[in-house]
Amino acid sequence: ADTDMALAVARARGTGATAIKIYANLDGQTVHRIIEEAHRQDFPVWAHGMLFPGLPADIVAAGPEVISHVCYLGYQLPPRPANYHERTGVDVSLFEAGIPTEITTLFDQMHESGIVLDATARIYAPGPGGDAPGSWRCEGDLAFRLINEAWRRGVMISAGTDGDTAWDHPYPALHEELELLTDRAGLPPMEAIRAATAVAARAVNQEDQMGTIEPGKLANLVFVHDDPLADVSNLRSVAFTVRRGVAYQREDYVPVTEEEMAEIGS
């Protein structure tokens, strides 16, 4: 409460940061003060969907540019953890009859305010990038049901991964995220592609530079052999990529070796 918010935001801008990230333990009033001042200084804000004890409704009402981690929005319904370091699973029994009005109202408000949902589907899926069953996030298909509901209500979905694949994996975690958005969350392939391009550019406040193909934007492109609109996993059939107008052939890609990784780790 004693923080000089104008000075704090100005200092963040002065570091060269591109946005303010809000997470962990903050009350709703403080969240509102941070976002209000950041916007006064024309500085974007990314926030977790729950800021303990700040509720999802508090976060949405405060109006950040991006809200991250779809399952945090489930904490709008009690019971909920007391703080960030004591997170427990969302009570899936509350969603057995459908998505409650308290949650759909949040999605409607996000749509009306133009708030992007950085859904991070990958961390909710069993496997190397996700959590074990029964952990503190979402069990079963709840995360994917929430993503689908948000998308159907017009919320912009961004393809954030909140993690990476193993060092020896031939493609980054983004591909897993896109496949989960289509295969589990039910988004059409084109919507998943938009989540990784146009919406992602908006999420990081770079839509004037990238995200769509049009004059004046950076020539950052990927060319694939197979049709990703038929199956988004076809994005793995990379022929070549273009970064700032320079082409890089996939056939020239040299995977990192275990020895190189060991050297980096040391």
Segment roles from a protein language model:
Residues 1-11, 50-57:
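Short, acidic/polar
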Residues 11-19:
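Catalytic domains of carbohydrate-active enzymes, especially glycoside hydrolases
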Residues 19-141, 165, 204, 225:
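Active-site core of metal-dependent hydrolases
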Residues 198, 215-261:
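C-terminal cap of metal-dependent C-N hydrolases
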